[in-house]
Amino acid sequence: MADRNLRDLLAPWVQDAPACALREMILDSRVAAAGDLFVAIVGHKADGRRYIPQAIAQGVAAIVAEADGEAADGTVREMHGVPVVYLSSLNQRLSALAGRFYQQPAEKLQLIGVTGTNGKTTTTQLLAQWSQALGEMSAVMGTVGNGLLGRAIPTENTTGSAVDVQQVLSQLVEQGATFAAMEVSSHGLVQNRVAALPFTAAVFTNLSRDHLDYHGDMESYEAAKWLLFAEHRVGQMIINADDEVGLRWLAKLPDAVAVTMENNLVPGCRGRWLKATQIDYHDNGATIAFDSSWGQGEIESRLMGAFNVSNMLLALATLLSLGYPLDKLVIAGSQLQPVCGRMEVFHAEGKPTVVVDYAHTPDALEKALEAARLHCQGKLWCVFGCGGDRDKGKRPLMGGIAEQLADRVVVTDDNPRSEEPQAIVADILSGLLDAGRVQVIHGRAEAVTSAIMQAQENDVVLVAGKGHEDYQLVGNQRLDYSDRITVARLLGVIA
């Protein structure tokens, strides 16, 4: 492991750095230990250089720290016998630095990056399931966790730090992974967390309102997503042509694969493409007939709703662009399983059908309700809330969407965090034409229970917002709570 030596590690940036052996690469001084390399970056909330004395006291072997300007780039000092190397623009270089430290793990597998507001988790899971069915050892990285397929370990962020990402990829390679599908968040792109990764392919799902508390406006949010295609090493590019932003990007990416279920192909398009020619929705999912640059076929999907047809087609186009055979993909497609907490259906005889979904944006809630309606013979119920300390502007929008598309609406708490639940609910209700038609039940388990107990056998109850999550954030507490387990207990089935 030649690059676990400070001199070798820094060779591209610093001549004759001190030669010392390194154990692990650490960003958090609190977990630094003897032999580690502590990297002191200037973050959004804290200046890591303030914690250099603590890291030294804990026995680190060396430190790489943000330099004060380009003039100090490459400067080497010593503090209490520990070498400190200063690099300018350290945040931008961190992905490359971590890549060298962990022996460039992304070069040793097929790495697929999936970005977009909604559909990232399902698309990455479909890519991993599908490729594994065709012989790969597949892994996922994202919202529901990182790890080999079926063995993902839960994570806090969709895209971890630049060091976390390279470390996880290194672990996956050690475990035998040959294929990894990674969710790439807008935060991760803006903060350079995947800057040095070579993506075999990159997928764009869609763009709608989310994270405006961070990005400020939709233009900045779109620009963040565009970074994956404009400034990263990407082989194949797969773009959803049914999205307004995607259609615009396709005009700038002539070699990208256009994917559509609405026949949104540019007339005279010379690039590669895949389109649905017929979609039949039924109780168990959908039958999807398609045509493409690689040929025609038909897939039986077990996933609910139109947006999952889009996710399926994006995954299919990605694998076709990488050379996987069409006939084998079609056969394996019927075996793909729905994703935990993503339009996950719970059935019990004599009870309403309940669907648990992660939808927590206006667009996602709209699509989830439209999907549930396709499979509903009776009334459509919607139980949802909005998270605290996040974009307040989407709350009335989501209230209006629920009122318009559902027959019965129950507004409840999501993750209120430090906000008053009553204030969040008031924001939601402000978007309704007739707030009197809506039930407000703050306790989430009570709200879910009430909706299911009131609903009839033919009805569908959509429980939206938390999906796979097994906790609720109230104040500074992290409480044990799961929509999936609550629903399963009420219906007498296994979650």
Curated annotation (Swiss-Prot):
Residues that coordinate or bind ATP: 116-122
PTM: Carboxylation is probably crucial for Mg(2+) binding and, consequently, for the gamma-phosphate positioning of ATP.
EC number: 6.3.2.13
Residues annotated for UDP-N-acetyl-alpha-D-muramoyl-L-alanyl-D-glutamate binding in this entry: 27, 29, 44-46, 157-159, 185, 191, 193
InterPro entries: Mur-like_cat_sf, Mur_ligase_C, Mur_ligase_C_dom_sf, Mur_ligase_cen, Mur_ligase_N, MurE/MurF_N, UDP-N-AcMur-Glu-dNH2Pim_ligase
Keyword Cell cycle: yes
Keywords assigned: ATP-binding, Cell cycle, Cell division, Cell shape, Cell wall biogenesis/degradation, Cytoplasm, Ligase, Magnesium, Nucleotide-binding, Peptidoglycan synthesis
Pathway info: Cell wall biogenesis; peptidoglycan biosynthesis
Binding sites annotated in the UniProt record for meso-2,6-diaminopimelate: 390, 414-417, 465, 469
One of the record's GO cellular component terms: cytoplasm
UniProt cofactor(s): Mg(2+)
Subcellular location: Cytoplasm
Sections of the chain in a coiled coil: none
Listed name of the protein: UDP-N-acetylmuramoyl-L-alanyl-D-glutamate--2,6-diaminopimelate ligase
